[in-house]
Amino acid sequence: MKKNVIEVKNLEKYFEVSSGFFSRKKTTVKAVDDITFEIPFGESLGLVGQSGCGKTTTARALCLLDPKTGGEVNFYNNDGSSMQSIDELEGEELKKFRRNIQMIFQDPYESLNPRWTIKDIILEPLNIHNIGDLDEREEAVSEILQTVGLTPPENYMPRYPHELSGGQRQRVSIARTLIMKPKFVVCDEPTSMLDVSIRISIMDLMLNLAKDLEVSYLYITHDLAVARYMCNRIAVMFNGKIVEIAETEELLSNPVHPYTKRLISSIPVPDPSYDRKVYDVNFDELDSLIEKYGSDKPMIDIGNEHYIATHDVKGLI
């Protein structure tokens, strides 16, 4: 039986927004609404969906960057023998949790301090957690720069972020994340702002590091091709809810939910003569059905560990 590095149960994140400048009335936006998933050690889950569906909000809640409204998030205990709720963490345990869960942000141009050298940027988490002495920390920086392909490291350590290309900056972001030797990394579209020519090299780097360092990923993307390349499983998110989740090849070859079918049919095909079915989905009707039937019932297994939301989707295709 597989051991999970993280288990998410009925996670919710709501925001209150004002109805207008002169109005005191507030409405609740359900950015993340009752989602459940788990990620085993050494595996990656792709979280896909359109912009604004709640992917990044989910990531920030898992990393304790934003407080969740409800639900449970259980992370593996430091001894690896049991799970522990992140709500119970405090003091030294909370500090260890932050070492074991890290995040790679989308924009390498904004996630690095422009006034710091590359050496200082990567040293920062080691300094915060007081890991090793100065010589050991500098040696660790040199080793991780070599690991992410920035060699020789002594040429990069004194540089500033503006002196690097986009791909090199993202490698620095990855180095800063992995120098803590985390067990779980949230990747918020880390290749979406990079040129296509270097995107594949960054993804290959992340896959190799995941294998070598036994890291699990939650990989957020709107690109199904990227999710297929990076992930063991894919969860499809729509308006704050997960509507379908399955093994990667199972989901892409046998999509069931109409929104998943619509996403897959929107993938560009290089052959202009290729005739494929395009699914036309009434999103307003779909959203109302999910709101009506999807909140208080668990997802159902339709076989091959392929789960789908239990609302009625007939007639929506």
Locations of the language-model features?
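Hydrophobic anchor residue at the start of the ABC signature
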Residues: 174, 202
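Conserved ABC ATPase signature
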Residues: 159-164, 168
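A short, proline-enriched helix->beta-strand linker immediately N-terminal to the Walker B motif
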Residues: 179-183
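ABC ATPase NBD Q-loop/coupling interface
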Residues: 72-96
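A short, surface-exposed alpha-helical micro-motif characterized by mixed small hydrophobic
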Residues: 227-229
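Short catalytic/signature loops enriched in Gly
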Residues: 2-4, 18-22, 28, 83, ...
